[in-house]
Amino acid sequence: MSEALTIEGRKQRARFRAWHRGTREADYMIGGFFDRYHATWSEAELAWFEALLEEDDVDVMAWALKTQPTPTRFQGALIERMQELDYVDIPR
């Protein structure tokens, strides 16, 4: 039970960090990705996202937009999902 709480606590912290990046564009991209997919993440996927949050927003956005190659440590299904950009909801 405490392990589940730990994972939920990590997800809460990750959500805050995903939505408070410093620019609105990064908030929508990274926060929107978190909101769309976090509910089904395994512990390994959550760890991947936590590591991604440590990277500079400019780099993360460049990887998501495919304007720079994604480093090997972030390659895989999650970055491919992020590159689809179908989760970005821009309020009008």
Residue ranges of each PLM-predicted region?
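Positively charged, polar, low-complexity stretches
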Residues: 2-92
